[in-house]
Amino acid sequence: MSATKPRLRSTQWFGTNDKNGFMYRSWMKNQGIPDHEFDGRPIIGICNTWSELTPCNAHFRKLAEHVKRGISEAGGFPVEFPVFSNGESNLRPSAMLTRNLASMDVEEAIRGNPIDAVVLLAGCDKTTPALLMGAASCDVPAIVVSGGPMLNGKLEGKNIGSGTAVWQLHEALKAGEIDVHHFLSAEAGMSRSAGTCNTMGTASTMACMAEALGVALPHNAAIPAVDSRRYVLAHMSGIRIVEMALEGLVLSKILTRAAFENAIRANAAIGGSTNAVIHLKAIAGRIGVPLELEDWMRIGRDTPTIVDLMPSGRFPMEEFYYAGGLPAVLRRLGEGGLLPNPDALTVNGKSLWDNVREAPNYDEEVIRPLDRPLIADGGIRILRGNLAPRGAVLKPSAASPELLKHRGRAVVFENLDHYKATINDEALDIDASSVMVLKNCGPRGYPGMAEVGNMGLPPKLLRQGVKDMVRISDARMSGTAYGTVVLHVAPEAAAGGPLAAVRNGDWIELDCEAGTLHLDITDDELHRRLSDVDPTAAPGVAGQLGKGGYARLYIDHVLQADEGCDLDFLVGTRGAEVPSHSH
């Protein structure tokens, strides 16, 4: 703890005996708060994304109670407040559309209220980046408490994974391998408790990223949602955030360039979601840390994927916790000289390496040795070329090795509705060597960059035993999904990107090793085609231009995938200077 305590923001509400202090205290006292609670102790916000519409976060009211116990025990004053809960499971057209809106909610709630530090209760995919983005814009002391994954999914005595099983079973249904009854019987078995997806999807990936970044306590990522140790971690986080408030340990001291480099390496080791590329860029943008797509190649390249979890591997998240969780992975990386910045500071005041140097590994089938990885080179690939001049991403650990270098004929879907209307057509001119191309599903074009990039294959090819094809889009893909899928093509079609120029029958070349994605037409032909494209005609854009509202604001200001899909006016740190009095 520093020798001089920082001045707490909350004293500018409750620390005076004038009219303003009287009013602020009086209003709070209608909740039964006694005088001694206003003695200058740190006021700790608990930013809660609980909602019955976000089943991943359905247990957060109980989680918040355990955080409060820790805060009170440490001498703090807990105040819980709600923010927009942008859950992936129900929210249309995409939770990505409202990630930035949720971050604005968080930022303004922190800055405008008597909050000295904040605990971020995050669970479903976009809640973690949204909360971190908002808190980073204020640069206050903050700690992430993730909700944790669901219990293992079960079907007919076997483990099944959230999301992953949906894609697998639906493909089997379309191929005629199972009937509808068998397909629907998996619903309850896949989701057996509160919590996030029990695979290494985006929610678990971002929980791991929070831990690797140092903004969460060790083991935050993997403890199952309904395990009592999840509530112990919440309690201990409540204790620690009070200490952080008194120490002045703000996010900018933790979310450094070194921390982001550690997170990129960790993402490769766990086989994490491609969505982390967008979210880490957005968080870095809010805290003022430069982070580029090339960093993913430089740091992630040649990193073995050593965690054998669905969708890349065999096991669900519950087994990951029992094996040792992320600390065991980080220790293994560190001992192999693969942890870029072991001295990076974390929320408990220790270095990342100090937190993990003694971490045990209880199951080397789940967390493998470096010399026996699941994938020898598992880092997310960044692709560039005339089809993606500002980049695209591909996840090798979820792809088919034989398709990572491929040349095929394009089968083009102008938008998601076009895909849905034609994919089941037995007359569709497509074969296993074709490259499926989906346009107008990016940040502006959808809008909100939905998770539709892992297009299901045509039933006629599934019946032939085809399991994977090269797919290219400006969309995203669920972290629970798999396949040789090129995502986040930038610029997107609805921003006038080259993807808009692709036509049926064009030849496309993918070379993952070389990092290239090439449309085999001349530059002159590409320019000629693009001159005929009207980006405002994309269905997602055209459908919103006359309506106004948040979606219109988003379309007008959203950045491209390589820039993190933040709104242009939100990038940067605005601090937590106390605003003027409200009366």
From Swiss-Prot:
Belongs to the IlvD/Edd family. It comes from the Bacteria. It comes from Azospirillum brasilense. Catalyzes the dehydration of L-arabonate to L-2-keto-3-deoxyarabonate (L-KDA). Is involved in a degradation pathway of L-arabinose that allows A.brasilense to grow on L-arabinose as a sole carbon source. To a lesser extent, can also use D-xylonate as substrate, but not D-galactonate, D-arabonate, and D-gluconate. Activity is enhanced by Mg(2+), being optimal with a concentration of 1-10 mM Mg(2+). This is L-arabonate dehydratase. Keywords: 4Fe-4S, Arabinose catabolism, Carbohydrate metabolism, Iron, Iron-sulfur, Lyase, Metal-binding. Changing C441A: Increase in activity and still binds a 4Fe-4S cluster. InterPro entries: Dihydro-acid_dehy_C (IPR042096), DiOHA_6PGluconate_deHydtase_CS (IPR020558), ILV_EDD_C (IPR056740), ILV_EDD_N (IPR000581), IlvD/EDD_N (IPR037237), Sugar_Degrad_Dehydratases (IPR052352). The lineage of its organism: Bacteria, Pseudomonadati, Pseudomonadota, Alphaproteobacteria, Rhodospirillales. [4Fe-4S] cluster binds at C56, C124, C197. Its EC number is 4.2.1.25. It is an enzyme of class 4 (lyase).
